[in-house]
Amino acid sequence: MASCLALRVALLLISGVLAPAVLTAEGPQEPDPTLWNEPIELPSGEGPLESTSHNQEFAVSGPPFPTSAPAPEDSTPPARVDQDGGSLGPGAIAAIVIAALLATCVVLALVVVALRKFSAS
C-alpha cells in the first residue's frame, strides 16, 4: 500500500517536472501561415484593385486645400508586424515558463495535501 502511494507520488512529481519542460520546448521550425501574411479576400471574386492611380494628373492650379492638423493617433507610427514566421518573443516565453512553474507548484501542493489527508486517517 505504501509502495503504491509512493509510486503514485513519484509519477506525479515526474510528470509535474516533465510537462513544463515539454510545453516550453522549441516548436516546429516550419513557419505556419499567419493571418497577416494571407492575401485579402475580395467578396466579389475580382482581382485586387489599386486605390491610387499613377496615370492621372490633376490640372488644379493654386494653393492646396487646407487640411486640419493630424490627430495624435495619426502621428503614431504603425506597429511593426513580426515577420519571423510565428516565433515567440522573450516576454511570451517568460510568461509560459512562469505559468508552467505555477502549475508545477499547484500539483505539488495537491500532492502534499493528499499525503497529509491519507497519512492522518
Swiss-Prot record:
Keywords: Cytoplasm, Extracellular matrix, Membrane, Secreted, Signal, Transmembrane, Transmembrane helix. Its main location: membrane. GO terms for cellular component: cell periphery; collagen-containing extracellular matrix; cytoplasm; extracellular region; membrane. Residues 1-24 form the signal peptide. Pfam families: DUF4690. Induction: In chondrocytes, induced by BMP2. GO terms for biological process: cartilage development. Expressed only in cartilage, including nasal, knee epiphyseal and rib tissues. In proliferation and hypertrophic chondrocytes, detected intracellulary and in the pericellular extracellular matrix. In primary spongiosa, detected only in the extracellular matrix. The chain crosses the membrane at residues 93-113. It comes from the Eukaryota. Residues 26-84 are annotated as: Disordered. It is a single-pass membrane protein. Coiled coil: none annotated. Residues 114-121 are cytoplasmic. Disruption phenotype: Mutants are born with the expected Mendelian frequency and show no differences in fertility, gross morphology or body weight. Secondary ossification centers in knee epiphyses are smaller and growth plate maturation is disturbed, but total bone length is normal. Central proliferative and hypertrophic zones are enlarged with higher extracellular matrix volume and rounded chondrocyte morphology at postnatal days P10 and P22. The keyword Cytoplasm applies. Residues 25-92 are extracellular. It is found in: Membrane; Cytoplasm; Secreted, Extracellular space, Extracellular matrix. Interacts (via the extracellular domain) with FGF2. Plays a role in the regulation of chondrocyte maturation and postnatal endochondral ossification. May inhibit cell growth stimulation induced by FGF2. This is Protein SNORC. It comes from Mus musculus.
